[in-house]
Amino acid sequence: EALGLAKKAYLPSVDLYFQWNRATRNNTFGLVFPGAGLPSISGPVVDAASTQGTFGSVAAALVRWEALDFGVRSAGVREAEALRRRAAAGTRWTEIEVSLGTTDAFLGVAAADSAVRAAAAAVNRMDVFTETISALVASELRPGADLSLARAELARARSELIRSEALRERARVDLAEWLGRAGERVEIEATELLESSPATEGAPPNAAVPHPLAELGEAERDAARARRDVAKGAYLPKLDVLGAVYGRGTGAALDGSFEGGAEGLWPERTNWAVGLAVRFPLLDFASRQETKVREHLEEAAEARYEHAVERVASELGRARLHLDSARRIAENTPAELEAARALQVQARARYDAGLAAILEVAEAERILRRAETEDAIARLDVWRARFEVAAAEGDVSPALSELQ
């Protein structure tokens, strides 16, 4: 709408004017400065003044077109276009932020689910182990201290499960808020996500579409330049083309008599006129100072644009580094998990054979639970890093398509 309004400045203005009045016709010689609301009168001076009134009417069509403005209107159009691009870029960036926030909240719930499953598995293993030790202690095959330590580890595992469940509920609340469903309970199914990973080489970004942050900076710079040009043209001459067609009617005659009746209600005398007018604000020093201010604002906008370009490049570099490290960690955690599972089995076997203390079993259980959690989180972190790269590239559509 603002762009269309700016373009309409090129069109001529056409005003229609109608007036009816009833007034006296007394006139005199002399000059009076025009004042607001002070009526004017035309016609010869008649010696005999009269208080009698008569009808008068005016009908006119007035045309004015600014033929030359030294680029002021074109600068206004450029400013409106830049503001339109800024609004569009702001909308795109908001959409990216919402998509990234929603995805991050979803992955947070998935990670919390994985942590809950790992904690629940640890509780089950320690529960079974504690029952076994209880039987051994009852048979006086193990010291009572082992049972106390096993129960302490079981209680610690249950506390970890409670904390994990609380974190999962908080993550669900965050996801519901991003989805616009605050107050509702949100359930997700992330099994397929945990079993997959994004493509090694994601779909290339659309090079024809700039990053919205860079486009925002560019649009603000262009708008500042346009405002500078508008300020420059404010104190330059303006050339107007003028035209008018108008008619007047009156019930007063040249000799001072009155025709009476309805005479004067209809315009009887018509005229036309065309002309050129030049306007030059000779002493408009404020506009010249405004130009200097606009030039400084343009320099500031240019600096912000360059900073935005650098920021986009830096964010993309950091996101790609995150994705690379996340992939390598996800490739390493399965080996860590396999070793932790083997350690847990071996520690349990050594304890059952009387070759290891219960502390070794407890430590193996903690290592296994941590490895199970880290393995799931590592795979989810690859997806999180993939979306960070997509956001840094300015288009999350390719990353979203990989989820489908």
Task: Describe these PLM feature segments.
Residues E1-G108, K238-L239, G243, A286-S287:
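Short flexible linkers and secondary-structure junctions
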Residues E1-W20, R25-T28, E66-A67, A75, ...:
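Bacterial Sec-pathway N-terminal export signals of envelope proteins
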Residues K7-K8, G53-G56, A67-E95, L149, ...:
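Sec/SRP-type N-terminal targeting helices
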Residues K7-Y10, V14, E95, T102, ...:
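Coiled-coil heptad-register positions
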Residues Y17-L62, E192-S197, D229, L242-F280, ...:
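Small/polar, glycine/serine/threonine/aspartate-rich low-complexity segments that form flexible
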Residues R22-T24, E365, E372-Q404:
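Acidic, low-complexity, intrinsically disordered peripheral segments
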Residues E95-P210, H322, A326, A349, ...:
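Periplasmic alpha-helical coiled-coil/stalk elements that build and connect Gram-negative outer-membrane
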